[in-house]
């Protein structure tokens, strides 16, 4: 259920964009992201920092898009969010308090060196996606950017998640692998 909620704003943005335009879709994205927070809190009594940061960025850039009637703001939102995620992961790793390990380390027991590899892998991924977003957003058509944002970045994120899980599992001690397979 939680993963479905993560996709709700993206699906609504895409559907509204296809029916109307980028401006109505931006407003719908703001509303859907707010709804996502409300439903998540109602169901789980907790809101993750990532969702809160995304909501603030969607609201900020979406509002600027609507006020100035300029889609450049909503296009920049993607890169800014990825940059913030990359910075947060990098800083947490440099401070020896890796975010990914704190989120997943209880379920996936691996050496700190492996968590560092995973962290830097995701930092690189977020930076690359942010840079590619700039290229697609400002060099190609708006429709191409929307499709890239919805399908391309989602697919890349899912692929990288699978790669990460495989890498973590491969580097997990045998006794922990057996526990997970029970």
Swiss-Prot record:
It comes from the Bacteria. InterPro entries: YciB. Coiled coil: none annotated. Keywords: Cell inner membrane, Cell membrane, Membrane, Transmembrane, Transmembrane helix. The keyword Cell inner membrane applies. It is a multi-pass membrane protein. One of its GO terms (cellular component) is plasma membrane. NCBIfam families: ispZ, PRK00259.1-2. Belongs to the YciB family. This is Inner membrane-spanning protein YciB. It comes from Shewanella woodyi (strain ATCC 51908 / MS32).
